[in-house]
Regions:
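Short, ordered loop/turn segments at secondary-structure junctions
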Residues: 11-15, 38-39, 63-66, 242, ...
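Rossmann-like NAD(P)H-binding beta-loop-alpha module
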Residues: 26-30, 34-100
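Loop/helix-junction capping segments adjacent to catalytic residues or to phosphate/diphosphate-binding pockets
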Residues: 9, 16-17, 41, 109, ...
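C-terminal catalytic/substrate-binding lobe primarily of soluble NAD(P)-dependent oxidoreductases
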Residues: 80-300
Length: 300
């Protein structure tokens, strides 16, 4: 950024830790900082923009998750499955323990300014055909406390979805004619994200259009580290998808005193934390590394 170069971030973990600072720095330097196309956050953002552009109110935006949740998963416990999939066991562990979904939906939340419904989100089990019955407000039989939320569902992976509504009679009539349902809630679903195949689109967007695909516009959500096992003084925290921690998405307003997942790799444990509990900052001695220094700048 300081050299006047556009930055297309393939590491979403970095975005949910210091992305707001990077976006601000890029704006000052007249360059683009963006999460790269290809993964669910940008795919969701594109579907969100599409939904709004054609006149809908977005009730819920999110992604499908296909791996059963196991917040105790480690590279060791998943080694054989990872080898079968030709994957890095640590990466697979970050999917199975839920960290990756929490990270991706936090990036989306901060990028579009739409909050999470609650700590950890709802994550109902749902077929695509039932998304517009599940991810809607409780008052209409769904799981959301309120409309306008970021969430996810077990089942409709690897796609992304936008649950929308409208009071426009012309759109309602046309949606019925197009066999999209009688409303009041409709599901717009994109059944894929194409990873590195899509990533080059980010280059064109940055260089030709001078636009980001997704960047933080606010900081309303945070991924907090939780203990994957009992942590004791003297332990050292390893990285995302490791043996000691996993991530849970929080409304930022509920994170006082808690340690963001992206800051704790290499931290020394100085206070006990029970398995499954959020990790307090006071229980860690954070490393004096670049990511923590940049986060301090973001906080200030």
């Amino acid at each position: 950024i300081d050299a006047g170069k556009h930055i297309l971030m393939l590491n979403v973990e970095t975005d949910i830790t210091i992305g707001l600072y990077l976006a601000q720095q890029a704006k000052e330097k007249g360059v683009v900082y963006s999460v790269a196309n290809g993964d669910e956050p940008v795919a969701c953002k594109e579907l969100y923009d599409f939904s709004v552009d054609i006149g809908f109110e977005v009730v819920c935006i999110g992604k499908g998750k296909n791996n059963p949740l196991d917040q105790t998963a480690t590279p060791e416990s998943l080694h054989d499955r990872a080898m079968q999939k030709n994957m890095n066991p640590k990466m697979l562990a970050s999917f199975v323990d839920g960290s990756k979904t929490m990270i991706e939906m936090t990036a989306l939340s901060n990028g579009i300014g739409m909050p999470l419904d609650k700590v950890g989100m709802n994550g109902p089990v749902s077929e695509v055909s039932d998304l517009n019955r599940n991810l809607i407000p409780e008052s209409d039989g769904g799981v959301l406390k309120e409309s306008g939320r970021v969430d996810f569902a077990f089942g409709p992976a690897p796609g992304v979805f936008s649950i929308v509504t409208t009071d426009n009679p012309t759109i309602i009539e046309e949606m019925a004619y197009l066999s999209m349902g009688e409303g009041p809630y409709y599901t717009l679903y994109r059944p894929y994200h194409l990873a590195s195949v899509e990533a080059p689109r980010s280059v064109g967007m940055a260089i030709i259009n001078n636009e980001p695909g997704l960047q933080p516009t606010t900081w309303i959500s945070e991924v907090i580290g939780h203990a994957k096992k009992d942590l004791k003084p003297g332990d050292q925290i390893d990285g995302i998808g490791g043996f000691s921690s996993y991530g849970v998405a929080y409304p930022y307003s509920e994170t006082d005193g808690l340690a963001p997942l992206g800051l704790i790799e290499g931290a020394k444990v100085v206070g006990e934390v029970k398995q499954g509990e959020p990790i307090p900052r006071a229980s860690l001695e954070l490393p004096d590394n670049l990511i923590n220094k940049l986060r301090n700048k973001q906080n200030n």
